[in-house]
Amino acid sequence: MKILIAEDDLASRKFMHKFFSEYGECDLVVDGLEAIEAYMMSIKEEEPYDLICLDIMMPKVDGIKVLKAIKELEEKNNVLLANRAKIIMTTALGETELVKEAFELGSDAYASKPIDLKKIKQVMEKLSLIG
């Protein structure tokens, strides 16, 4: 499985990397602009991500705008529905409006911080990423 972790907080990024690396190859980015660039590169190289873990509050470009960009790139590049990355939005905020917007834009799941690994594993099972 190919995984993109977009997280600006170093401790959270390391924590998520340690967990997700058990399931596949992880690329790490620290801001929204890098996330968009990494996604574009994965499409160009025809090695799309299976999972994107995307922080809502990031520098340069926030997670909501990154999500919009990913969905637009999927449409533009005619990425088949079955091949589209599963997206888990994360945030330490209790911003229900942002979470609602993320789901409306096509996020597959949401995880609040601090990340509960048991819940993330359940989400991955629900999304058919792991058995």
What are these regions (language model features)?
Residues 7:
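Conserved acidic carboxylate
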Residues 14-21:
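Charged docking surfaces used in two-component/phosphorelay signaling
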Residues 82-83, 94-109, 122:
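Alpha4 helix (beta4-alpha4-beta5 surface) of REC/receiver domains from two-component response regulators
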